[in-house]
Amino acid sequence: MPSCAGLAVPYVPFQQDAPKKYAQSEALSNGTLFPGLNLPFHLKTEGSSLPSTPLTELQALEFVLLELGIYLDTHPDDAEAFTLFKQYAAMEKAAKAAYESKFGPLTKSAAASGERYSWLQEPWPWNYEQNEVK
């Protein structure tokens, strides 16, 4: 980090094309897909480890999609990032369909696709740990 970038003063480095990327679960834990943007504010803390559940895996995929979308907003000509975005979009779509078929709908609009309205049925998505209800 440049010496002119004080920790209490907002500073965001310019992203270069094809920046390094965290793995999806590590990105979710650190709050950014890009290690170059993982800057300290006062004290640097390492990302916490999240439990490995189907829901956190889906959340990690969705987080990476959001981060890549923001990156592509400022780098629309980065073909490698766009290819990666399309790959993650397909992975997220498949993971969401698999999750909802096993555990039930994640959104109210998904509850409309079943045989009957199933939004308020327990267990809730956050009550699952490693495919079992806690």
Residue ranges with predicted function:
Residues 91-106:
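Amphipathic alpha-helical coiled-coil segments
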Residues 54, 58-72, 88, 92-95:
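Non-transmembrane amphipathic alpha-helical segments
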Residues 79-89, 113:
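Short, charged, amphipathic alpha-helical segments
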